[in-house]
Amino acid sequence: MQWEVVIGLETHTQLSTASKIFSGTSTAFGAEPNTQASPVDLALPGVLPVLNKGAVERAIQFGLAIGATIAPRSIFARKNYFYPDLPKGYQISQYEIPVVQGGSITIQVEGKKGEVYEKTVQLTRAHLEEDAGKSLHEDFAGMTGIDLNRAGTPLLEIVTEPDMRSAAEAVAYAKALHSLVVWLGICDGNMQEGSFRCDANVSVRPVGQKEFGTRREIKNLNSFRFLQQAIEYEVQWQINEIEDGRKIQQATVLFDPDTGETRAMRTKEDAHDYRYFPDPDLMPLEIDAAWIERVRGELPELPAAMQARFVSQYGLSAYDASTLTASKAMASYYEAVVAEVGAANAKPAANWLMGDVASQLNREGISIDAAPVKPLQLARLLARIADGTVSNNTAKKDVFPAMWAGESNGDADAIIAAKGLKQMSDTGELEKIIDDVLAANAKSVEEFRAGKEKAFNALVGQAMKATKGKANPAQVNELLKKKLG
């Protein structure tokens, strides 16, 4: 039987406010346990929550960026459940009327055969809520410690429709969402610190069946790699269970990165289990049109708009434009390079950024902001390739690595001069070298004239070797063809 995978994601995005959503306590990461917990966060009697305006504005920003509806009036609700790190016995969230409704995110997905296709993922909602505290299970002689520093941290929970049909699509969506919230500046995107966490709702059904299968929710996935591994394992587990004649039970599961397996944590709750009701301590959130338009006017150019501009202005492919706008820092770097080399060299600049620069960044595990070669320095190297001072191959093999290592303060001209890498510009000298190559390789000349194209490439190689790689390959080709008739 053929199976179809159905995936929906819920993403908890920590908003980049300096203080918590309902108190003035700091949200800074890494403080000593329980040093950033106010009476509101601790749920002490007689204290009331006060909504953080900055959290609301970040939610509006996100809603506008995805083409969603911003609710003119939304309500905060109490989500009731008992857990040691939830001191109130309930979490303040939004249920019936969220602040952000609908919207979509378009993603680029790499298929199984390497082809890239586009897909639009519809969003159900995004709602504001507070985070819970943290339970610590180590170093307490078998007991659990509670750190409430995180309690009350502002979250925007972003929920998709069950639109994704593979782990690859889910990861592509998560990466696109991560890029967007970081681009907007509403989240720092630090997955190691818990600023961006995904829950994956996964089910399978026979191909062609309209009804959804029973879903299981994989909680708190804090890396794209874990997201992919967890979904792939869960999908195969569910298929095996069904094919062995067992029914899938709705459940919340955890992913163990050490074993690569998911395991059930508890029976999955439904909404009625949480006994949602409007929070009597908070007034409804009212957002007028003027507020929305003010926030809209402060939005940066969005990734989708920039992608379209890169295609029309610089002649890039949709895939290249998507890659270069994966982060605001990368897009800014690229535009800074193009500003120096001109639109005519926009494509070579893109190739360098997605090729050699990206390879070095990945090798060292750093972001483009930390790249030792700055935009102006890379632009100077591209200019030397364009004016024929060095070949593209020499630039890649000899000049760029030296720039990255900080030789001559990363100055391309100084490195070219110091290493003697400048291409030959004397046509007469090059013609003499080619004459010598032809005389020394009579057999290759005969083979070429007999119709063997490989012989021509061999002659080009010999000429480049004779010039120690300093000749312009295009000029070598031209002169050889001229002399060979």
From Swiss-Prot:
Gene3D superfamilies, per the entry: 1.10.10.410, GatB domain, N-terminal subdomain
UniProt GO molecular function: asparaginyl-tRNA synthase (glutamine-hydrolyzing) activity; ATP binding; glutaminyl-tRNA synthase (glutamine-hydrolyzing) activity
InterPro entries assigned: Asn/Gln-tRNA_amidoTrfase_suB/E (IPR017959), Asn/Gln-tRNA_Trfase_suB/E_cat (IPR006075), Asn/Gln_amidotransferase (IPR018027), Asn/Gln_tRNA_amidoTrase-B-like (IPR003789), GatB (IPR004413), GatB_C_1 (IPR042114), GatB_Yqey_C_2 (IPR023168), Gln-tRNA_amidoTrfase_suB_CS (IPR017958)
One Pfam family recorded for the sequence: GatB_N
Signal peptide location: none
EC number(s) per entry: 6.3.5.-
Protein's GO biological process: glutaminyl-tRNAGln biosynthesis via transamidation; translation
Catalytic activity reported: L-glutamyl-tRNA(Gln) + L-glutamine + ATP + H2O = L-glutaminyl-tRNA(Gln) + L-glutamate + ADP + phosphate + H(+); L-aspartyl-tRNA(Asn) + L-glutamine + ATP + H2O = L-asparaginyl-tRNA(Asn) + L-glutamate + ADP + phosphate + 2 H(+)
Domain of life (superkingdom): Bacteria
Entry annotated with the keyword Ligase: yes
EC primary class: ligase
UniProt keyword ATP-binding, yes or no: yes
Keywords from the named record: ATP-binding, Ligase, Nucleotide-binding, Protein biosynthesis
Function text: Allows the formation of correctly charged Asn-tRNA(Asn) or Gln-tRNA(Gln) through the transamidation of misacylated Asp-tRNA(Asn) or Glu-tRNA(Gln) in organisms which lack either or both of asparaginyl-tRNA or glutaminyl-tRNA synthetases. The reaction takes place in the presence of glutamine and ATP through an activated phospho-Asp-tRNA(Asn) or phospho-Glu-tRNA(Gln).
Subunit structure: Heterotrimer of A, B and C subunits.
PANTHER family assigned to the protein according to its UniProt record, in alphabetical order: GLUTAMYL-TRNA GLN AMIDOTRANSFERASE SUBUNIT B MITOCHONDRIAL AND PROKARYOTIC PET112-RELATED, GLUTAMYL-TRNA(GLN) AMIDOTRANSFERASE SUBUNIT B, MITOCHONDRIAL
Family as reported in the entry's similarity comment: Belongs to the GatB/GatE family. GatB subfamily.
Name the record gives this protein: Aspartyl/glutamyl-tRNA(Asn/Gln) amidotransferase subunit B
Organism: Cupriavidus pinatubonensis (strain JMP 134 / LMG 1197)
